[in-house]
Curated annotation (Swiss-Prot):
Annotated organism of origin: Candida albicans (strain SC5314 / ATCC MYA-2876) (Yeast)
Example GO BP: fungal-type cell wall organization
Regions of compositional bias (Polar residues) in chain numbering: 500-510
Residue span, Flo11 domain: 55-278
Gene name linked to the record: RBT1
Phenotype on disruption: Leads to hypersensitivity to calcofluor white (CFW).
Task performed by this protein: GPI-anchored cell wall protein required for mating efficiency, biofilm formation, and virulence. Involved in normal disseminated infection, but not in intestinal colonization.
Signal peptide positions on this chain: 1-20
Induction / repression: Expression is negatively regulated by the TUP1 transcriptional repressor. Also regulated by EFG1, RFG1 and RIM101. Induced during hyphal growth, during mating process, under alkaline conditions, and by farnesol. Repressed by fluconazole.
InterPro entries referenced in this protein's UniProt entry, alphabetically: Flo11 (IPR018789), Flocculin_t3_rpt (IPR025928)
Membrane topology category: Lipid-anchor; GPI-anchor
Name of this chain's protein: Cell wall protein RBT1
Record field: compositional bias (Low complexity): 454-499, 555-575, 584-663
Length: 721
């Protein structure tokens, strides 16, 4: 309980110390890196007590004073005479950082800092702290007033008179911009564009101080105005600005300067002043029991120590704070309960060859170790109880201690002698304490939880690759637009490789390791690799769905036969095939626009010498019979037409006429397909003669009337629809 309370207090102290700063001027600029937290704060502060508050000023004025006690006017403008503004500087806090450096809180204030900031603040080019032992620190822009600020910075201390002090190269540098009245005034008054404050060396002794009181005393000790005559007597050679403006600035500088450019030296304690760790003692002993072989008391010592205790003959490795107890084991001779050993130690702890408070002729004293023994509190006759401490070596045992030593029994006594080792300030002392018999029984229970693997499915060593599947009835010259199968394409395309596990899934005995042969197939090539893994069962299944629309009809390309009388046939039903005359070629069909702005289209190609048109129910077909004496077969053509339309036979053309095609189109809006009739022209021979049948005017007039009625009916139907 006491140890836990001390830990909580230390943790709270550490958390609060990380944010502890002690500025004297309000806000503080913290430039200590965050990766170096403080180890301890509030180190004792010291300063050079031999220097009075006005000592530096008085010394400087004494150097520039003449015999009659007045200050020479010629000293103004001389470099080094007026080296800086009158300023107060105090270190208000020091802390040790984790990397061995120190963090200090500095406070700086010039005389009439508000007026100086108003007159020169905007003309300050650089404000920095140098000589800290680390990188320079820029304060300009990080502090509101360059003439009054507080900053927390990291320094590498110098040892002076046993204390850590500011480095001898510590500087506060203020640099001003050029080509302005302010610069001319600064240069005229100080002889330079820079004002540098440096640290004094410790002359005699250092003493403690109160930071706030010392800072206020320095501020009140600023010197009074210097007694001067007219400022016009100052040398203003090369100054291009008005003398009035320059005079005002020089008046302010005269008010706040005393010829001092040095800072007091400040020191602090180098080490943290922390109390020594306290020691606690926990004692346990075994319960009373009888044994025919031993009568020595058994004792257990628990030591909390912070420094090593060495012995001439043995040593044990470093132990950590562990509280353990052994499981009771009973020998045939007795049934004494187990002994608990509690060890809280952070340094090696060894025991001398023998430290027995009580001895008997037949057993060794408790807490003694023999060079041949490896268990704590054991004797050649196994008289002292033993305890096992997992993962830790108990103090006052030898290096060979094993955590699985068997327990032995001894006779319990009414008193127990405990040796307590107390360490403080790098010194340790031992004391013996006699206590009563206290039996502490403890037991450790170890729970091991695991999830057994009940089934192992081996990964198959081979896979089947499915080849490319194309849609059936697909011609090599064209791909049907109706096909939507993702894998039906030209022969050059290939379907993705599908891996299908082969072999049944079986249950095998659980193994600790599994060597898996992985066969990877890609781009018609497979490779095998072996991988050693733990027993991991992964069951996965890939389902590949292939959807395609088969092509039910294939139309082969038909080549035209030259110098041949063989008829060309087509597989379209309800179509008659007509023989082709020698040396005859079918002209291309011409599509005439349908009546009532209904276009007549034909989308299927026609083979040479053959006309393919769908047959319309109720159509009347009239063959056209040309007279060709030398032709091998007359060209007979089937021309289905729409219902109610009559086709007139057409006589062959004269020998001198060219090939023409006449088409008769009948269109019914929305329901009747377009019917085309093609009339081929036959090349006549030299001796051929033709007979032209006469057509009566009555017959032609009848045909014209029918066509007129049909056109009128079709037009009326189209208008009504």
């Amino acid at each position: 309980m006491r140890f836990a309370t001390a830990q909580l207090a230390a943790l709270a102290y550490y958390i609060l110390s990380t944010e502890a700063t002690f500025p004297l001027l309000g806000d503080i600029f913290n430039c200590i890196p965050h990766n170096t937290p403080p180890v301890c704060t509030d180190l004792g502060l010291y300063h050079d007590s031999s220097i009075s508050l006005g000592g530096s000023k008085n010394k400087r004025e004494a150097e520039i004073a003449n015999k009659d006690g007045t200050i020479e006017k010629r000293t103004f403008g001389s470099a080094g005479v007026n080296a800086g503004f009158n300023a107060a500087f105090v270190v208000s806090n020091a802390k040790k950082l984790s990397d061995g450096s120190y963090g200090i809180d500095c406070n700086f204030k010039s005389d009439s800092s508000v007026q100086l900031n108003s007159a020169f603040g905007k003309k300050v080019k650089q404000l920095s702290i140098t000589g800290t032992g680390y990188s320079d620190i820029s304060l300009l822009g990080n502090v509101a007033n360059p003439f009054e600020w507080s900053a927390s910075l990291k320094v590498k201390a110098e040892i002076v008179k046993g204390k850590c002090c500011l480095p001898s190269g510590f500087r506060i540098v203020t640099d001003f911009e050029s080509n302005c009245p302010e610069f001319d005034a600064i240069k005229q008054f100080f002889g330079s564009s820079q004002i540098i404050y440096k640290v004094n060396a410790v002359s005699n002794a250092i003493g403690t101080f109160d930071a706030s009181a010392l800072f206020n005393a320095q501020v009140k000790a600023f010197p009074a105005k210097r007694e001067l005559d007219e400022f016009e007597e100052l040398s203003n050679d090369g100054v291009t600005h008005s003398k009035r403006t320059l005079g005002l600035l020089l008046g302010l500088l005269k008010k706040v300067t005393g010829g001092c450019d040095t800072l007091q030296q400040f020191c602090w304690d180098c080490q943290c002043d922390t109390p020594s760790p306290s020691t606690t003692t926990v004692s346990t002993s075994s319960a009373p029991s009888t044994s025919p072989e031993s009568s020595a008391p058994s004792t257990t010592t628990v030591t909390t120590s912070s420094s090593p205790v060495t012995s001439p003959e043995s040593s044990v490795p470093e132990t950590t704070t562990v509280t353990t107890s052994s499981v009771p084991e009973t020998t045939p001779e007795s049934s004494a309960p187990e002994t608990t050993t509690v060890t809280t130690s952070s340094v090696p702890s060894t025991t001398p060859e023998s430290s027995a408070p009580e001895t008997t002729p037949e057993s060794s004293a408790p807490e003694s170790s023999v060079p041949e023994s490896s268990a704590p509190e054991t004797t050649p006759e196994s008289s002292a109880p033993e305890s096992s401490v997992p993962e830790s070596s108990a103090p006052e045992t030898e290096t060979e201690t094993t955590p699985t030593a068997h327990l032995t029994t001894t006779t319990a006594q009414t008193t127990t002698v405990i040796t307590v080792t107390s360490c403080s300030n790098n010194a340790c002392s031992k004391t013996e304490v006699t206590t009563g018999v206290v039996v502490v029984t403890s037991e450790d229970t170890i729970y091991t939880t695991f999830c057994p693997l009940t089934e192992t499915t081996p990964v198959p060593s081979s896979v089947d690759s499915t080849s490319v599947t194309s849609a059936p009835e697909t011609t090599p010259e064209s791909t049907a637009p109706e096909s939507s199968a993702p894998e039906s394409s030209a022969p050059e395309s290939s379907a993705p490789v599908t891996e299908t596990p082969t072999g049944p899934v079986s249950t095998v005995t659980e193994q600790s390791k599994t060597i898996v042969t992985i066969t990877s197939c890609s781009n018609n090539a497979c490779s095998e690799s072996k991988v050693t893994t733990g027993v991991v069962v992964v069951t996965s299944e890939d389902t590949v769905y292939t959807t395609f629309c088969p092509l039910t009809e294939t139309t082969p390309a038909t080549e035209s036969a030259s110098e041949s009388s063989a008829p060309a046939t087509e597989s379209v039903p309800a179509t008659e095939s007509a023989p082709v005359a020698p040396e005859s070629s079918a002209p291309g069909t011409e599509t005439a626009p349908a009546t009532e702005s209904a276009p007549a289209t034909e989308s299927s190609p026609v083979a040479p010498g053959t006309e393919t048109t769908p047959a319309t129910p109720g159509a009347e077909s009239t063959p056209v019979t040309p007279v060709a004496p030398e032709s091998s077969a007359p060209a007979v053509e089937s021309s289905p037409v729409a219902p109610g339309v009559e086709t007139t036979p057409v006589a062959p053309v004269a020998p001198s006429t060219t090939a023409k095609t006449s088409a008769l189109v009948s269109t019914t809006e929305g329901t009747i397909p377009t019917t085309l009739e093609s009339v081929p022209a036959i090349q006549p021979s030299a001796n051929s003669s033709y007979t032209i049948a006469s057509v009566s005017s009555f017959e032609g007039a009848g045909n014209n009337m029918r066509l007129t009625y049909g056109a009128a009916i079709i037009g009326l139907a189209a208008f009504l629809i």
